[in-house]
């Protein structure tokens, strides 16, 4: 089977790896000069298998109103003329109930835990390195109220058998002694010992090199113009003015996936959630994080690589704008100076932004479509790095008609369709859509 993958970020590259291992002839195309150079380039570096949570959560609507007036708000909305922005926001608000939050988080945890297993197996098989650490993650709470709210997450962690520890202030410093130099005294924290860290871009590029050795063809500098449709089937894509035919096409274009699908009448509710990062040369290891922490108040993570510190997070709903907002840099600098002062060189920091492809419910869109030969692997939001290996392996099983190792419930685009459209992929299990 000849498979054409559109996009060579971490999602497209892991898809290529697993499809190649399944015996497919794989071609990957991307507009950049190499793999992992857009949203995968400088994300937070957290592999948050246990921390997986949707942005749509109880209390977020009221918080969003308050955040409108805060300089360092974790979520901001910049109105555009794009009607899709408002439709997406309205759908997200519908998922902020406790009931929907529990359903969505359970789906995300299912995929994230599977992805942890897949990444561990891939690493053992290939020996791939990406400045990774297996030292867990810590979610820091600045207020007792934040600590009290985490109870609902703990219930789901217990349900899925995910190890966790609720830390007292003294226990926090045991795992992250560098926090003692900071100006904040946290009343408590949640530690997830099975979570990891690593450089997503480094992983993507090294996995692409390994996949190329297996025969996967990577073509860079390629613009995907449109999909080729023959009746009920997608038969390829027009790339740089030429038709590239394939038995199966995988759309892994992140936030740009809906733009390619719209001419086919497929309204995919994926919208850019703009994130920011600041990468600093490390200047004092004793004052740096041992692993990674997430400041819950600002949704900013501080992560340690070998000789670098990555400060990343926040979300800005502002369409496809990729300009660098100096106010967001100020927030990143404020947080790292609060928690790990003196750990990195702010004067030599690399400021970056990326468009994270978010769904209203937080769960990605992986699987079949109403068109034969067309599959999706997109919509991972802030958790593309976390979910990448599991998503790629799961998709390869679907495409190759093999039994999936996890339930497909709620993972494909059919959950968004109001009317019941039967899945045309004969082998891929589809879940009946829900309104």
Swiss-Prot record:
Pathway assignment: Amino-acid degradation; D-alanine degradation; NH(3) and pyruvate from D-alanine: step 1/1
Gene Ontology CC: cytoplasm; plasma membrane
Catalytic activity: a D-alpha-amino acid + A + H2O = a 2-oxocarboxylate + AH2 + NH4(+)
Enzyme class: oxidoreductase
Function: Oxidative deamination of D-amino acids.
Gene3D superfamilies xrefs: D-Amino Acid Oxidase, subunit A, domain 2 (3.30.9.10), FAD/NAD(P)-binding domain (3.50.50.60)
Family: Belongs to the DadA oxidoreductase family.
Keywords from the named record: FAD, Flavoprotein, Oxidoreductase
Classification of source organism: Bacteria, Pseudomonadati, Pseudomonadota, Gammaproteobacteria, Lysobacterales
Claim: Hydrolase is one of the keywords in the record: no
GO molecular function ontology, one term from the record: D-amino-acid dehydrogenase activity
Signal peptide from the UniProt entry: none
GO biological process terms held by the UniProt record: D-alanine catabolic process
Protein name: D-amino acid dehydrogenase
Record-listed FAD binding positions: 3-17
Gene name tied to this protein: dadA
E.C. code: 1.4.99.-
Cofactor(s) this protein cannot do without: FAD
């Amino acid at each position: 089977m000849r498979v054409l993958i559109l996009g060579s970020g971490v999602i497209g590259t892991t898809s290529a790896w697993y499809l190649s291992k399944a015996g497919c002839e794989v071609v990957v195309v991307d507009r950049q000069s190499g793999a992992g150079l857009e949203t995968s380039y400088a994300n937070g570096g957290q592999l948050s298998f246990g921390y997986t949570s949707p942005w749509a959560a109880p209390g977020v609507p009221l918080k969003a109103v308050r955040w409108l007036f805060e300089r360092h708000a974790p979520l901001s909305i910049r109105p555009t003329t794009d009607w899709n922005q408002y439709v997406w926001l309205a759908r997200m608000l519908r998922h902020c109930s406790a009931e929907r939050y529990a359903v969505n988080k359970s789906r995300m945890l299912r995929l994230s835990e599977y992805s942890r297993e897949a990444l561990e197996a891939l690493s053992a098989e290939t020996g791939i390195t990406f400045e990774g650490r297996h030292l867990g993650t810590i979610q820091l709470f600045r207020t007792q109220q934040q600590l009290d709210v985490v109870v609902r997450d703990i219930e789901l962690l217990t349900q899925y058998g995910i190890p966790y520890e609720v830390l007292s202030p003294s226990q926090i410093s045991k795992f992250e002694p560098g926090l003692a130099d900071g100006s904040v005294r946290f009343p408590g924290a949640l530690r997830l010992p099975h979570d990891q860290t690593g450089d997503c871009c480094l992983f993507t590029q090294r996995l692409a090199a390994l996949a190329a050795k297996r025969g996967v063809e990577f073509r860079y500098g390629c613009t995907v113009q449109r999909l080729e449709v023959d009746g009920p089937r997608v038969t390829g894509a027009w790339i740089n003015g030429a038709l590239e035919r394939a038995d199966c096409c995988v759309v892994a274009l992140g936030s740009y996936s809906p733009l390619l699908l719209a001419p086919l009448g497929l309204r995919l509710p994926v919208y850019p959630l703009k994130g920011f990062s600041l990468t600093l040369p490390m200047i004092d290891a004793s004052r740096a994080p041992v692993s990674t922490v997430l400041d819950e108040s600002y949704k900013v993570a501080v992560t340690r690589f070998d000789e670098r510190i990555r400060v990343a997070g926040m979300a800005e709903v502002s369409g496809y704008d990729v300009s660098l907002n100096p106010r967001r840099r100020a927030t990143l600098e404020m947080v790292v100076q609060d928690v790990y002062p003196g750990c990195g060189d702010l004067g030599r920091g690399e400021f970056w932004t990326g468009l994270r492809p978010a769904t209203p419910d937080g769960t990605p869109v992986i699987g079949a479509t109403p068109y034969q030969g067309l599959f999706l692997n997109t919509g991972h939001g802030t958790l593309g790095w976390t979910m990448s290996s599991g998503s790629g392996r799961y998709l390869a099983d679907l495409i190759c008609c093999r039994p999936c190792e996890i339930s497909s419930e709620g993972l494909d685009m059919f959950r968004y369709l109001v009317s019941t459209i039967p899945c045309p992929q004969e082998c891929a299990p589809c879940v009946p859509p829900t309104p």
